[in-house]
Amino acid sequence: MITIPITLRMLIAKYLCLLKPFWLRKNNKTSVLLIIIILAMILGVVKIQVWLNDWNNDFFNALSQKETDKLWQLVLWFPALLGIFVLISVNKTWLIKLLTIRWREWLTDYYLNRWFADKNYYFTQIYGEHKNTDNPDQRIAEDILLLISKTLSLSFGFIQSLSMLITFTVILWESAGTLSFTVGGTEWNIQGYMVYTVVLIVIGGTLFTHKVGKRIRPLNVEKQRSEATFRTNLVQHNKQAELIALSNAESLQRQELSDNFHTIKENWHRLMNRQRWLDYWQNIYSRSLSVLPYFLLLPQFISGQINLGGLMKSRQAFMLVSNNLSWFIYKYDELAELAAVIDRLYEFHQLTEQRPTNKPKNCQHAVQVADASIRTPDNKIILENLNFHVSPGKWLLLKGYSGAGKTTLLKTLSHCWPWFKGDISSPADSWYVSQTPLIKTGLLKEIICKALPLPVDDKSLSEVLHQVGLGKLAARIHDHDRWGDILSSGEKQRIALARLILRRPKWIFLDETTSHLEEQEAIRLLRLVREKLPTSGVIMVTHQPGVWNLADDICDISAVL
């Protein structure tokens, strides 16, 4: 009984887990049909290789016999064989690419849905045993493509190699004949000796390849991680360019990037040193196999058991058998890379399966907190003895010193902080406005209106921009620019309030939303919000005393600590 090592069993289990979502889904007939067509093309390629092998035999026999007419027939027949071979091979590659993009599109959408479901993209950073998983963006952008492309190329390559192996093993057995020799007065006849020889050589070569290259897999995992970290830090540097320049922090950032690249360099050296030994062996192995069949067939040729055509046919069959039987040796690098990708993507898969079980009750008609306490992930108390009630149209101020836990309480009410005890009810679709609004690159109108439930015409948008003090931007709503870099902190907060007025949410959580504005302007804008959204319930955090008078009620966080 064959025993599969536990590490390999675990890898296979991870692999199947990643394959099942796409291939076991309903309405997948087109992808299955593509698989069938590609497999048929693979069999067509194998058949053409058999024809070419026969052509090789006939050509060299005609050449040795100097049969001019037959040689010309074979020369004219070769372009037809080549044309059919190229036609099938090119279209097979095209269909594999089509299947790749179909699979990638579906799987990318699948993992994006898992990542964004129930705010999972946020919880993956703070929740569970995999919270420190690096670069989830790379898992979606790169690892999915690598998984699919490697799976298809290796799978179809293996099937083609297996088909070629079976076919040409039969041909090699028949064409090479029997090796006869005498040892100690005993005559030995070994039929199919070429097949036995190539099998033994490849088995030994495969075992040696695995011994030499088994360290490549963890090095590939490290390579992907270090490259992703370097790329991410470069992106962050670009985003924070202004802050770095104002802080004169260039040398610090430069050193950090140099340290990141040093990690890449160290991994590269370890990987290339390990790869060198594998390359030594693969080159020795492949070069030796290219001439070995001549030596093995020499006794048969000298004794007249096979002619020149038979020699070339058997040699080609030997090469095809050895090459396809050596599939594992030649594909070891790709298999190691695929294994590393499986590990990384499965880790991300596990990450997106984690869900916090503790959530506030979803309540649309009020925010209710009774005998509640807010805690850290390690169960330390941040706030306790919390009790308040907010009805639609009412404003509540959360008051307390910096660091008291006001923002954490707002996160809890927004269903983004699962560490609490007690009775908390709040709407799951509330609108949270932070002191640093998300402003991306793009058309200004799209940036402001993208999340709105209904379309907004230019006139309405222009009117709201004037109301929040951004009238100068009304003429630029169709401009495409890097607004996150262009707008000041105060202008970004005005944009956030414009979004709020246009969206008209029923429940609003304001977290230092006007902190970058002068107090009188903050009062004016929040009064505008209350005027435009009279039925919306609002819970706000602010350190601007003049704004406190806008609240109907105050919950002093400091008093419950």
Curated annotation (Swiss-Prot):
SMART domains documented for this protein: AAA
Membrane topology: Multi-pass membrane protein
Positions with a binding annotation for ATP: 400-407
Pfam families: ABC_membrane_2, ABC_tran
Span of domain ABC transmembrane type-1: 35-337
Chain ranges on the Cytoplasmic side, renumbered to this chain: 1-3, 53-70, 173-187, 312-561
Membrane topology (Periplasmic): 25-31, 92-151, 209-290
PROSITE patterns recorded: ABC_TM1F (PS50929), ABC_TRANSPORTER_1 (PS00211), ABC_TRANSPORTER_2 (PS50893)
Compartment annotation: Cell inner membrane
GO CC annotation terms, alphabetical: membrane; plasma membrane
Transmembrane segments: 4-24, 32-52, 71-91, 152-172, 188-208, 291-311
Keywords: ATP-binding, Cell inner membrane, Cell membrane, Membrane, Nucleotide-binding, Transmembrane, Transmembrane helix, Transport
Domain ABC transporter: 367-561
Molecular function GO terms recorded: ABC-type transporter activity; ATP binding; ATP hydrolysis activity
SUPFAM superfamilies: ABC transporter transmembrane region, P-loop containing nucleoside triphosphate hydrolases
Entry's family note: Belongs to the ABC transporter superfamily.
Identification of the protein by name: Inner membrane ABC transporter ATP-binding protein YddA
Organism this protein belongs to: Escherichia coli (strain K12)
